From Swiss-Prot:
InterPro entries hit by this protein: LY6_UPA_recep-like (IPR016054)
Chloroplast keyword on record: no
Keywords from the UniProt entry: Disulfide bond, Glycoprotein, Secreted, Signal
Domain UPAR/Ly6: 28-114
Protein name: Prostate and testis expressed protein 13
Localization per record: Secreted
UniProt tissue specificity: Strongly expressed in the epididymis, including the initial segment, caput, corpus and cauda regions. Weakly expressed in prostate.
GO cellular component: extracellular region
Organism of this sequence: Mus musculus
Length: 137
């Protein structure tokens, strides 16, 4: 009996969304990378998932790290972390010269792609997205 129940739960969770099937997404998929340099993931891009049921837990998180440049007086982008942790947006001064900025997104799957960085040019991001679309086809 338990095996049939478990099988039915997995069928519902992994069911393909089509026009004949009335489903809603129970899972949120996010990118997972511990060192994203603004262009690519240094240690390999992975994915993670979480249940998309509770409003406070359905976000994908991007943590941008900035270091303070003494010569210019500006915080410059260093790297980003992409993950599935519960998110609290905002800025946090980690050390005297390291700042962490956290972005949360809930609009779609894999929405934490590292493009929420203000130091990256929008022209470069559009070019990266076009290359990605061409490679996906």
């Amino acid at each position: 009996m338990f095996q049939k129940l478990l099988l039915s739960v997995f069928i519902i969770l992994l069911m393909d969304v089509g026009e004949r099937v009335l489903t809603f997404n129970l899972l949120r998929h996010c990118n997972l990378c511990s060192h994203y340099d603004g262009f690519k993931c240094r240690n390999g891009m992975k994915s993670c998932w979480k249940f998309d049921l509770w409003t406070q837990n359905r976000t994908c998180t991007t943590e941008n790290y900035y270091y303070y440049d003494r010569f210019t007086g500006l915080y410059l982008f260093r790297y980003a972390k992409l993950n599935c942790k519960p998110c609290a947006p905002g800025m946090y001064q980690m050390f005297h010269d390291l700042l962490r900025e956290t972005f949360c997104c809930i609009d779609r799957n894999y929405c934490n792609d590292g493009t929420a960085n203000l130091d990256t040019s929008s022209i470069l991001i559009e070019d990266m997205n076009q290359k990605k679309e061409l490679n996906d086809d």
